[in-house]
């Protein structure tokens, strides 16, 4: 499928291309900010500027619910929603520029990897994990403060209240436990350091379950957006709309359950394994403190007691 066909399928209609001066300004500013925020990840400011300045960037009409900016790897282009003020383009471009830095292609120019996400012939693994990690990196570059939010009955604090908030909450938990630096370094350099560290800490089975669950949350959210857009195109409420609304509620319930199950798995798999490796009182105290402060990353809902029960056992 051509890029034009894919854009049309996704409801993206190009209005205009950004001029070279604007693209170069965005490339320069973003390369400076990335290198300043992540000085230890082997990034070179001039190399980044050259790489990012070669991107094409467009203003486009986009359907409701779609991200305000989208990167298309097939033509190395970023598409911005027409409603974004020119002064805000840079903040929205950061996430998409990180995607461009991440991409790994084979000799036939097929995408095989993007950060923490692997593109195989039959399935994509780690899409939700990667999107959340990139968004957390972008939030760090921009300097977004954490705020309290509530989604699908889940209360938590996040530095990404508007984009992938539930996925970001779970990935922030992983960053706290495994290490933010190893997470972000693997994300932007597209390597397995974070994955290997997680497998070493929680087991391969638990890592795959966590990764797949975050993907599932992302896919359910995307399905909700598509259904809402279909409902918006129907003039009169009828049985078909009622079935769509029921499907949305079922998806929301499934997202909540998946989030809680995944959070519980993160807690039990990490802390059970860590507890078994304790050899002295100093290790025990470090374990206790780390478990206690996990509460700062917790998503809570009515009737949720797993973390408190785990802590006092």
Locate the predicted segments by residue:
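Active-site recognition of the HExxH zinc-binding catalytic motif
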Residues: 91-107, 131, 135, 139
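Post-HExxH zinc-binding segment in Zn-dependent metallohydrolases
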Residues: 116-169, 173-175
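Short, solvent-exposed secondary-structure capping/transition elements
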Residues: 71-72, 102-112, 142-150, 180-186
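Nucleic-acid nuclease catalytic cores
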Residues: 97, 104-123
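Hydrophobic (often cysteine-bearing) scaffold residues that line and stabilize catalytic clefts
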Residues: 19, 23-26, 90, 126, ...
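Auxiliary, metal-adjacent structural segments of Zn-dependent hydrolase domains
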Residues: 10-87, 107-110
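Pan-zinc metallopeptidase signature
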Residues: 8, 154-312
């Amino acid at each position: 499928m051509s890029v034009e066909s894919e854009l049309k399928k996704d409801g993206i209609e190009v209005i205009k291309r950004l001029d070279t001066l604007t693209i170069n300004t965005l490339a320069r500013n973003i390369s400076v900010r990335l290198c300043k925020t992540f000085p230890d990840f082997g990034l070179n400011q001039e190399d980044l500027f050259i790489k990012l300045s070669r991107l094409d960037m467009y203003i486009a009409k986009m359907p409701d619910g779609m991200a305000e900016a989208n990167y298309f790897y097939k033509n190395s282009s970023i598409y911005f929603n027409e409603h974004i003020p020119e002064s805000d383009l840079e903040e929205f471009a950061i996430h998409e520029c990180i995607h461009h830095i991440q991409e790994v292609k084979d000799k036939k120019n097929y995408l095989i990897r993007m950060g923490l996400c692997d593109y195989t012939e039959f399935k994509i693994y780690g899409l939700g994990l990667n999107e959340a990690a990139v968004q957390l990196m972008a939030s760090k570059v921009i300097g977004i403060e954490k705020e309290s939010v509530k989604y699908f009955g889940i209360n938590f604090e996040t530095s990404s209240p508007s984009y992938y908030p539930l996925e970001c909450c779970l990935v922030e938990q992983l960053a706290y436990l495994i290490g933010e630096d190893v997470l972000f370094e693997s994300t932007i350099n597209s390597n397995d350091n974070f994955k290997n560290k997680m497998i070493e800490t929680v087991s391969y089975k638990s890592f795959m379950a966590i990764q797949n669950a975050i993907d599932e949350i992302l896919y359910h959210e995307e399905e909700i957006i598509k259904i809402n857009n279909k409902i918006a195109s129907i003039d009169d409420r009828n049985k078909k709309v009622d079935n769509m609304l029921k499907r949305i509620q079922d998806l929301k319930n499934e997202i909540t359950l998946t989030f809680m199950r995944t959070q519980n798995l993160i807690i039990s798999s990490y802390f059970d394994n860590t507890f078994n490796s304790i050899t002295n009182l100093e290790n025990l105290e470090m374990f206790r403190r780390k478990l206690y402060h996990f509460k700062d990353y917790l998503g809570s809902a009515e009737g949720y007691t797993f973390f408190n029960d785990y802590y006092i056992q």
